[in-house]
Amino acid sequence: MASFQTLPEAVAALVHDGDTLALEGFTHLIPFAAGHEIIRQRRRGLTLIRMTPDLIYDQMIGCGCARKLVFSWGGNPGVGSLYRLRDAVENGWPNALEIEEHSHAAMANAYAAGASGMPSAFFRGYRGVELPEVNPQIRFVECPFTGETLACVPAHRPDVAVIHAQRADRQGNVLLEGIVGVQKEAVLAARRSLVTVEEVVDDLGARSPNAVVLPSWTVSAIAVVPDGARPSYAHGYYARDNSFYVQWDEIARDRDRFTRWIEEHVLA
């Protein structure tokens, strides 16, 4: 059952050096505040999983939190590249980073398999592409019923899943709505989970048709962190700070400027 904790308490209890960690949220509800707390607590040796690693993983990688990244597509959405990710891969700064690249379909299916307690995911994909040549985790099997060739990847079973949501009720049930990515699957696949929320309410209230409610028993800890997804957006609460994404392109290009920004805005 979910317990209500402060963000520093929850990260200290749930996220350990060497863990496999998934911070999920698709275009919005990206758990920036939680990622910054992980940086402040100086976690090291993490394997980071994310469908679309963007600024928060760029920051965590640049701060030396990660040893490996499992992902599909990485970039600064609508702007360009992730220069801290590139520096780690190309130059080993601040440390070497192993990468394992998949398609979006593979990542989503791997989360779904993990959430179902399955060891691997089977799906139609990777036909006529070269990614399987550089990723040995992508295999192909023959369906025993149809003879069709299917792609196969290991299930994602992170030690910890971290997401941001709009609200939780006082019983620890969590509501997220708007564009829903793989947050539900990531939480269900993980051994432990942390949800940051904008607010706690008596009743979750009216919800949109595509809303997801995570029952309390699926969540390890809830931390109330208003604005916890900024500079991404939280549907119904605040808009995306597009100007910051543009600014990050310049900040992240230079190691010294990046380090100063982290010291001033995350570690201070």
Question: PLM ranges: what are they?
Answer:
Residues 1-268:
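Conserved alpha/beta enzyme-core scaffold
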